[in-house]
Amino acid sequence: MNISTTRRNFLKTTGATLSLAAVAPQIFAADNQSAPPPGKRAIQKAIMWATVGFKGSVADKMKAIRGAGFDGVEMMSHMNHEEVLKARDEVGLEIPSVCGEKHWAKPLSSPDENVRAEGLAGLQQTLRDAKAYGAGSILLVPGTVGNGVSYEECWTRSITEIRKAIPLAEELGVKISIENVWNNFITKEDEAARYLDEINSPWVGWHFDCGNIIRYGDPIAWIRKLSPRINRYHIKEFSLDRAMRTGSPGKGFDVPLLEGANNWRGIIQAIAATGYHGWAITEQGGGDTAEGLNDLALRLEKILILK
């Protein structure tokens, strides 16, 4: 099956519908539009829990994260609430987002309805975890194209399952944020906007990853297109040069922040122009030691203060 051709034909059909975001953008407003509380900067620094690689308890890792200068941490779903909350409160970190643990293994795009049901249950548990931690957003990979799943099937199946979770998201006050990843799905900003348009809920927005998109397009164009529906940002580097030299696209991520292809000054200016107040969450290698965490926090700070 030619996935690219299938996608073009499918998007030609969906593109003929009216863009709801253009008609009523206010209904899609993200949870980032109000002014930050007194004493807090507009964009705060956080790190993805899964990138903190050294051994230790939840409390040990949170202390190291806080000691490095991070304000928050994006937890994984399906963790022990009591342990996480105790460590959070002792250390003084915030939890702005929770990343779903099940969405790759149990994709909402699966042709197997039992797998989709497990994926939906995982999504719903992630929402409950976020509520318990005081997080306003969760990260969701909506599905994958390939292995017998077409672009259209991924689109329709994932939207069907996400809609089933919206009532719980609304009840809990937690937003579902779709992340752009390397899943052969939604590689253009116009596609992302149409996807959110079709879901048509203020409880579903975007979790934009600046590094993942470099392989396909311009992060700044994505930011401008999807604002104000971006709830959270992943700050991650990618080197096109390294990816091409090694012949392995994944090797492009093996580069420190500020040393890849991202135009960070332009990205920060684009984010500021949208009026975003919220979280920049680093999903970057290097967090295997306290020294590595310190370096990540310093590099993230250098990015955020660019004018």
Language model features: what each stretch is:
Residues 271:
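C-terminal "capping" alpha-helix adjacent to the active site of nucleotide-linked donor transferases
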Residues 70, 135, 230, 276-277:
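A structural motif
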Residues 279-284:
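Short acidic/histidine-rich active-site segments
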Residues 14-22, 109-205, 215, 265:
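Active-site acidic/histidine proton-transfer and metal-coordination neighborhood
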Residues 2-132, 170, 201, 205, ...:
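N-terminal pre-domain/capping segments
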Residues 66, 98, 163-261, 265-268:
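Acidic/histidine-rich catalytic cores of soluble enzymes
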Residues 52-57, 72-84, 107-108, 146-150, ...:
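Acidic-and-aromatic substrate-binding clefts and catalytic sites of carbohydrate-active enzymes
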